[in-house]
């Protein structure tokens, strides 16, 4: 009997072990948010890496041309050309042009960590070139060893740091290796490989050039080159640990919001309706169509409005504000295009000699103040919409009123005082800058005590300047002034309207929400306003938007926004620390209410995670996940034991944890 019992125990242990293995295998078969391999390609043509099971194996490629004995290089980069981008199944297709050379690049995922690159190059004019090329940037931070091979034998084997400054050979493959990864370029035949050191860099950078065209080109010149890039290495599934500190409460976060600047009467309404009906919108920004409100200096816009002569653009903008106000959404009013009488010089909507916008005509300052104030008063009295803050959009850059920092300070004091004298509670936005990088623009007003009473909030747009040091400038400004911080235009690529197919790419969605989580953590904003919740930069696809004729439907970006927007209103920023560079996190909470939310973007492979520091009254966390194949999917609640919660982070996903008492 004893023997049989021990035997049964042994059998049961084996059965349990088999069941565990089956469970693991089943979990591996469950649909995840990444494919086995996928190229990360910027819409201007640069390959940034290959993702395998969510982990990015980095590359830095570009296309370009070389002149004057390789001393003059022009290469593809963000906002340097006007590329076109689209996807056809597993193929990403980019068409771009540098001077007379047109490139058509097709990057195709072909499985097993391998992508195929096909580049067709052609010329529209006769020109002497050293080469049109495909280029890889080599950094010791990514790879430390290079092996260039020919069919017969290796040609070059060297550490990246000790490469010759100028080297050329014929080769069939190039291998780049590091301690954890390898990337291999394989050519169907022998091809020229040129390696050159970047003498202008302090980071020991080298370039590998693969010529596509060499020598003088004519209008009839056309070439094609095809090769593969394979990536492999160790997939990092190591766990992540988050440490929450609830003893520090920073600035409040009202929630996620959006811009509602109307530009497309046909496509905008359906997107606006869907967003407002299906997502919690905490703040909104609308347009003052100033040039249509008062086109001429001598006109009385109030009289015209009272005589039913309100311009349709103005009426639509006011109706938009009224709709938002009816939903108890606070409003920011911004002006883009001024009327001619309000500015100096000939009004031009495009840059002149590289300079955008026109300065305000100081001689008409009183008339300018009155015109804007009349609009706000009319909006309040006739549409029952109250404007919380006013700004000129991106006046640091000139889109389309251009100001210096000193002029911006004068406007804040002058227009702010005019608002106050007419009984308005409307305050001025300090900044509303085009990018985080132009923070010096706000310094004159920051250092002027007289301006303080008229400033309602500090504001910038998130198109550029994402490094921590730059973002901390804005956090510091809000802290010093004791004012809220607003990201009045949130997104990541101001040129994306040129290649809108990128909006449906998981890589774009992940990069965008990653920035927002970093903004929450570093800047502690009152709100982030998506550019936009209309058909411009639409978070929806279909119904003819950007040429997509599918049924109207939300994209991954919409679900990212909805998940972020579901943060309980009015929570305070709280520190949450973790050491991984491929993860971003932000925490919000209210100790009095006992409510806590943690947002996490995992830019890498799947991994287990643990969070510590949760208050004892928190017994569980609701968990939501958005990724390529999941749309704010609610998972099994996560138990909290002794302030600690263990959960799983899926690859390349946005995860939100919300406390339950």
Language model: regions and residue ranges:
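Acidic-aromatic substrate-binding/catalytic surfaces of carbohydrate-active enzymes
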Residues: 38-97, 262
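Beta-strand-rich recognition/accessory modules
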Residues: 62, 66, 74, 86-90, ...
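Polysaccharide-binding surfaces and accessory modules of carbohydrate-active proteins
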Residues: 120-193, 618, 626-628, 632
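C-terminal beta-strand-rich structural cap/linker in extracellular carbohydrate-active enzymes
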Residues: 221-225, 232, 637-661
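Substrate-binding cleft and catalytic face of glycoside hydrolase catalytic domains
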Residues: 244-245, 279-446
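Noncatalytic carbohydrate-binding groove/subsite architecture in carbohydrate-active enzymes
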Residues: 377, 402-515, 522
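Aromatic/acidic polysaccharide-binding cleft in carbohydrate-active enzymes
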Residues: 484-563, 568, 575-579
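Carbohydrate-binding surface patches
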Residues: 577-619, 652
